[in-house]
């Protein structure tokens, strides 16, 4: 993605450091650089910096194609995209500065903790070299520090946060037009590195993605126009249908910054005003619902900025005492779509086959993972990260924490969706299940979401043998209810004991990720996702040998579920049997649970007395995290292909345990005053 260019003026060139802002329209960093003179467009691929959040296969496919279109657009304007492969982004920036004689660097803000620390380091290092560094907001309607309550404190509830955003005294900035022309800087001495985003074994699977998706900023703009002029009108009506193709499909475009959220907001508000003038109540309702999903995306960045550990630990301190079930067989059955609950299984098979899930199905499978199987929420979040086309750290963390109950405004922990009821709610005719579970395609609609209750004659007529060609339920809901009840009792006992120990002075609190140091909350230990087998992408292989994680910590944190129609409770045990295939798993061996460490401490964050209004539970997943589903055919579910290094760093109790993540976040707290950072010019 390199080419010959003209040169730099006496004032030097300006480097535009592209990251997740892969567009030429409404790109403040690019616009500022164009105004300053000759421009060098740069993308640095440094996945090692991301640790275990290296993009998965489908995300890398998207990134590859998005960069290609960005380079094409830049060439049409007069320059090109320089790509660098590195293990250190800041070092690469310095190299490009030296080889091009650039005097300024422009980039747009990111809000995840690793990026915050990296960007601060970049500003320090480059400024020390005499390079002017400027950064801009290109990803949010308002910067996180702009949205506060009357006392200047960050909000702890989404409803209050979004209400404040909509009532700000000034509107979000209007989107910028793309530049008409770019004067290119001299890159004759700056050799571009070829970037490899896929290997030969992945190309076959990736080729299928191109049939349904078109990455790139211009394609994202077309998708936005199509949505606003079509499906938006009935968004509120159709978005809850699991088999619906009427949602926006904008989430991957938003994640990679191909579409400006400001442009989305402004165009949707124009529609809102027009429909209000026409008295179109259905249209107004759809606009409000869609804007709320945009608000949830904003909130995910807001939470990540104000609580940089939110992708790794719960924000409600007592939930760290919940005894998570450490069961790799359950995890494997969930990934394979072999839980015995059709809606859950259909969703997991679609996820692997397409890299996509409707947000309602994301809620269902996540809820089942956490509440019925009671597996550690970070396992599920990491699997989503590896397999989703629109994997987004901030949005995924918000979604899993909300569903799991670890956000202050989550639903109660003892409530969960009944997959059978949810099936008839979101897939009333069973079309979605039949598409992704062909073994159930002949089952009548009356039984499609609970085949275990179907008469034997009906099963025989449909060619179904439960426990053979389709599994019985992996665990009964009554049993799950009892287990959850026991686990919650144990959690509260441990929390009370820890509080008593702290009050007696025999246990010392640890610092919280929040800025309120007087409300300590212990940093959780991580789950190690071991690469026990080499990556395989052969679709003909069975899915029994998918990779599974192992636990390294002595304490796994708990979470609550999102929306629910059933109270499920959990029992304590010692180990779980293999995934059942021939019988309902009602009397399995005791499940293994992580033992809570005696020295763990908890402290509730004072501001987090949270509740979310009932209707928000229907739409708790941000549009950036999910927005719809396209029609695709089902198929064999192959092995889990991990995105990159699956090593979760093992950490000691508290902050500063020696892991990469911990040291990054320590640095974040030591150096971060982002208000000052963002204004450094």
Swiss-Prot record:
Result of changing residue 21 to N: In cry1-401; genomes uncoupled mutant (gun) with defects in plastid-to-nucleus signaling
Binding site for Mg(2+) 1: 238, 246, 358
Keyword list, A-Z: Apoptosis, ATP-binding, Chromophore, Cytoplasm, Disulfide bond, FAD, Flavoprotein, Magnesium, Metal-binding, Nucleotide-binding, Nucleus, Phosphoprotein, Photoreceptor protein, Plant defense, Receptor, Sensory transduction
Location of the region described as CNT1, binds chromophores to sense blue light and mediate CRY dimerization in the Swiss-Prot/TrEMBL record: 1-489
Modified residues (Phosphothreonine): 621
Bias kind Polar residues: ranges: 583-598
Positions of post-translational Phosphoserine modification: 616
Binding-site residues, FAD: 235, 247-251, 293, 359, 390-392
GO terms assigned for molecular function: ATP binding; blue light photoreceptor activity; FAD binding; identical protein binding; kinase activity; metal ion binding; protein homodimerization activity; protein kinase activity
Residue ranges, annotated region (CCT1/CCE1, mediates blue light signaling): 490-681
Entry GO terms, CC: cytoplasm; cytosol; nuclear body; nucleus
Subcellular location: Cytoplasm; Nucleus; Nucleus, PML body
NCBIfam families xref list: crypt_chrom_pln
Record remark: domains: The N-terminal domain CNT1 (1-489) is sufficient for autophosphorylation and is required for dimerization. The C-terminal domain CCT1 (490-681) of the homodimer binds to COP1.
Name of the protein described by the UniProt record: Cryptochrome-1
Record lineage: Eukaryota, Viridiplantae, Streptophyta, Embryophyta, Tracheophyta
